[in-house]
């Protein structure tokens, strides 16, 4: 890991004096990759509504194999981090809440945002643990289905405040 970082051993341990600091750094790197993908979508002006969820879908499906392998390693580090550090777990929960709030603000209903987020989480974990290896057709089918869900519900930005509750007769 030290060699891949390009730092000296002393510099590495200066930035990450504890295992918890290293795990937090890895978590920050993973969340930064997602944030950068979203920002790129915003800057290029081609993003339709629900751009944050669309960016997460792109992150899961459109990266070359080498980048996906790097993401796999980061996801594995995140799993370890969440298991070993309450601070990493708290940051992960906060990042998930923020992602769901962003999707809601972009016009995606709560249920759809949760389904997409949990499907992507499951896909990332399945790839990370190597318990799933989708063939190209299956990957494309999953990707298309997630986009269909986004398209079906992302019509207008959500209002701030309490979520709309369905009324029953």
Feature roles, as predicted:
Residues 1-21, 25:
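Helix-turn-helix
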Residues 17-21, 25-28, 43, 47, ...:
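Residues in soluble alpha-helical coiled-coils and helical-bundle/repeat scaffolds
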Residues 37-74:
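Hydrophobic alpha-helical connector segments
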Residues 28-34:
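Short, basic, alpha-helical segments at the C-terminal edge of helix-turn-helix-like DNA-binding modules
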Residues 55-57, 72-76, 82, 88-95:
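Hydrophobic alpha-helical segments that drive targeting, anchoring, or assembly
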Residues 56-60, 75-79, 116-123:
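Short alpha-helical scaffolding segments that buttress acidic/His motifs in well-ordered protein cores
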């Amino acid at each position: 890991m030290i060699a891949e970082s390009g730092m000296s051993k002393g510099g590495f341990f200066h930035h990450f004096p504890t295992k918890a600091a290293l795990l937090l750094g890895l978590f920050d790197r993973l969340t930064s990759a997602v944030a950068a993908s979203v920002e790129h979508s915003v800057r290029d002006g081609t993003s339709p509504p629900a751009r944050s969820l669309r960016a997460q879908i792109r992150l899961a499906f459109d990266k070359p194999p080498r980048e996906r392998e790097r993401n796999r390693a980061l996801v594995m580090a995140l799993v370890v981090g969440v298991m070993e550090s309450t601070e990493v777990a708290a940051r992960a929960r906060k990042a998930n809440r923020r992602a769901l709030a962003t999707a809601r603000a972009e016009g995606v209903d709560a249920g759809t945002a949760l389904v997409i987020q949990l499907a992507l989480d499951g896909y990332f974990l399945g790839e990370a643990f190597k318990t799933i290896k989708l063939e190209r057709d299956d990957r494309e089918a999953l990707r298309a289905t997630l986009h269909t869900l986004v398209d079906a519900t992302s019509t207008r930005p959500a209002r701030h405040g309490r979520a709309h509750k369905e009324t029953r007769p």
